[in-house]
């Protein structure tokens, strides 16, 4: 039996705070790169590959996934790479942002990975073996009342597999999936876990500043983000409850809960304009420098890994 939500929240964040303080001296990290130095694919590669697939047979591993919807979901994400959507009320935000970056990095690899998972019940990518639990396999395709995610079984499968495989301190007391856990700590993504996913699976150099409680120290925040965006991808870890006055998450504390992938940042007078990916599309937000500083807890900078010249 799981402990009551309030007790679980207090226990998890007490432990999380200890872990964060222990690592506070290493707020800026440069992660080790994956061993694979091959070039990544293009959207054209993925489209050509998918166009050869007219239909899929039902999978014996995923009883609640409809083959036609699964294939359509893959084609939608390749033809409309902004479309990955984490679902209403879930804790899949980090996995949605990660998937958007994976699609930009290796779209063909994404398609082949999800097809292998669907057809064989397990799959390997970047040296990582995904072998989801039977509970996850039953849940995929059966999530309801999550908005358009309801009819996107490939994304349901993928987000559940990511949550099942990657664990952080927020997942300590809830490691095994039960129905409804997509909305709870089982699916949560803390900042270090998100960066670890990028490090292990994508062809990126990853630098990170900040944390789940400790804000990044950058001096001129606008200048720092502008500089990083000029040389690579920038992901911001923000307190979305300050931006949107609504119950976006089950987490009721004043902490960051949301990952956005920045597309553009400009400044006119005392107004900063952000354009970024989240929730399956592009969003524009205007705010003051003080409010920007208030909502940002993490800044992740990703640059494409260069192929080995040898």
Map each language-model feature to its residues.
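Solvent-exposed loop/turn segments at secondary-structure junctions
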Residues: 93, 100, 240-243, 282
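Acidic, glycine-rich loop-and-strand cores that form catalytic or ligand-binding grooves
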Residues: 197-209
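Bacterial Sec-dependent N-terminal signal peptides
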Residues: 1-30
């Amino acid at each position: 039996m799981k402990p009551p939500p309030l007790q679980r929240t207090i226990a998890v964040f007490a432990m999380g705070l200890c872990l964060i303080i222990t690592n506070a001296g290493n707020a800026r990290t440069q992660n080790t790169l994956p061993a694979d130095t091959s070039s990544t694919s293009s959207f054209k590669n993925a489209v050509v590959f998918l166009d050869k697939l007219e239909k899929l047979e039902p999978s014996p591993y995923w009883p609640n996934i409809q083959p036609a919807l699964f294939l359509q979901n893959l084609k939608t994400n390749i033809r409309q790479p902004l479309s990955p959507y984490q679902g209403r009320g879930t804790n899949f935000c980090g996995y949605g942002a990660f998937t958007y970056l994976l699609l930009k990095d290796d779209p063909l690899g994404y398609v082949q990975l999800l097809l292998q998972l669907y057809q064989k019940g397990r799959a390997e990518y970047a040296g990582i073996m995904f072998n989801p639990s039977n509970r996850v396999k039953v849940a995929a395709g059966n999530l309801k009342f999550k908005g358009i995610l309801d009819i996107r079984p490939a994304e349901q499968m993928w987000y559940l597999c990511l949550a099942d495989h990657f664990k952080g301190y927020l997942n300590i007391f809830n490691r095994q999936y039960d129905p409804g856990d997509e909305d709870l700590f089982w699916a949560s993504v803390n900042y270090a876990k998100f960066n670890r996913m990028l490090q292990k699976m994508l062809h990126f150099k990853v630098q990170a500043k900040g944390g789940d409680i400790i804000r990044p120290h950058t001096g001129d925040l606008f200048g720092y983000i502008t500089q990083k965006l000029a040389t690579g991808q920038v992901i911001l870890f923000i307190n979305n409850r300050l931006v949107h006055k609504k119950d976006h998450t089950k987490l009721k504390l004043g902490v960051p809960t949301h990952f956005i992938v920045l597309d553009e940042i400009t400044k006119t007078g005392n107004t900063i304009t952000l354009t970024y990916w989240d929730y399956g599309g592009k969003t524009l937000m205007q705010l003051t420098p003080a409010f920007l500083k208030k909502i940002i807890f993490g800044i992740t900078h990703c640059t494409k890994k260069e192929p080995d010249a040898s």
